[in-house]
């Protein structure tokens, strides 16, 4: 009985199909893994305009419009490309996940100006005074003080009690 001779590509085709399936499984697993992130966690507004909605879809009405890139939000729940978040004033609603980023930031709260100091001490040199509502990138916290950067150039230490977004969510 003669042996069947297969064309040279016959061995490659099953391998290519297996490789394609493997690649497809990785591509679909990444978004699923992102959906499984443990909540709560901090996120920052990436977009120049962000709509907060009453439900997890563009079909739901808008409850708030944010025009504050860098504003910290606490992510409370995940749902298919949407995040239930809480803002510094306690307002809650759903936002599109693609408009958020994982970079940590903090916003100045409380009454009056918050001193920004050169070091993490109340007797350290005063660098600037920050109004409530000023947003800065959070670089780290220690012993009741947080190092923040405002507008990419103003660096210093602010008492953690004057910030929202610095603590464990």
Tell me what each language-model feature is:
Residues 4-19:
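Bacterial N-terminal signal peptides that target proteins for export
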Residues 34-54, 65-69, 76-91, 95-120, ...:
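SH3-family beta-barrel domains
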